[in-house]
Each structure stands twice: as C-alpha cells, then as structure tokens.
Amino acid sequence: MIYDFRMYTLKPGATPDYRAGAKEIGLTVRQRHGAALAGWYWTEIGALNQVVHIWGYNDAKHMREVRAAFYADPEWYEKYSPRAQPLVETQKTWTMNSPAFAPVYPVIVDIPADGTPGFNKKNEMVFDFRTYTFKPGSIPAYMSAAEEVAIPIRKRYGVKLAGWYYSEIGDLNQVTHIWAFDNLKHLKDAKDAVAADPEWTGTYIPRVRGLLVAQNTYLMNTTEFGPVPD
C-alpha cells in the first residue's frame, strides 16, 4: 500500500468544527470510493491547531482513481469542501510507504457511539507522534533496528505501534512513527521504563546512533472515528 499523508494547520479554535465535518461528510465520501483511513490525529502538545489524516491506497493508480472519484462526488464539492476549506490555513502532503511490520487498517472502521466504552477509550488515548529526518541512505538500517529491537521493547511495556511511515514523495529521508498509549500516565510510565531497559540502552541506541539528523515530536489525540491498534 501507499499512503497520502496530510498535515493541515487550522485557524485557532477550528479543530472541533473541522473534525465534525470530517466525521459527518468527508470520511463517508472518501470511504465510499475506496480510501482506507489509516490515522486521524490532532495536536495536544507541539505545534497547535494541526490535524493529520492518513489515507491508504493499494497503489499509485488506485490513489489517482479514488481521489478523482471523491472530488467528483457532489457530496464532496457541494457539502464538504464549503464546510472545511474556510477552516484551513495551510496544507502539507507527502506520499509515504509503510513496512511490513506496521499495522494495516480496514477501509471502514466501526465508530463507537458517544459515551460507550469504545468511545471513552479512544478519548483517553494519547499518541506520541514522531517525525525523524535521517542521513541519506540510513532509513533501511533504522527500520531494521526498529523492527528487531525497538518495537519488541516498547511492546513489553504496553506501547502499541499505531503507524510507521517513510517518505516517498515530499520531504525525503523522513520517517514518521506513531505510538499509542492508554492515557497520559501510561505514556509517562512506559517511556520511563523503555528508557531504563538495558536492551534499549545497550542494543538499540548503539544501532541507531549517528543515523539521525533531526527529531520532531507531538503529543496527539485521535477521534472516535480514527483507527487505533487493538
């Protein structure tokens, strides 16, 4: 699969309205034509007023066909675009790939009703959303270290991989990895435990040292319609 990875900066205070429009119209229209929602996040700590939505397609041809189909859908250009566009200040997009060890989400995800356990669980979850820039040619070595060492260590402390992407078109030599936590306390406890794990300090860190150029991180929330790892 390939992924259309979109980061939008919204007008201050516009995130709830944008999220509601996505849930009520945009999501349905995209899914109707075959786009798979791989993630929907909004910033809590970091650069504020940002939303990230990630859409999966079988290949580049499928992406072109699906995007042409939903852009031509009357519900898109008559209802969704007029509602969403005035809320958006800037847009950035990348085409990303994902490795075999990353989760793949179904085209349509069940949306829990307000107040249900599933709804409350998603509202409590937090996501450590990390974008790393690497030296040219370094991503394969980093990917191997992540799969063989970092992911098993994080899993040991209840941390789940929500997404792992590397850039194909856009800003190159970048990896975005997204880690799911039950709540803020779990995030703090798990990160402390991972950092203190001897395998992390003795095996993982030496393998990736020297590969990175820059690191950026956000604390993000998801929505009731955003897919999350089991």
Identify what each model region corresponds to.
Residues 1-202, 206-230:
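Short S/T/G/P-rich N-terminal loop/turn motif that feeds into the first structured element of a domain
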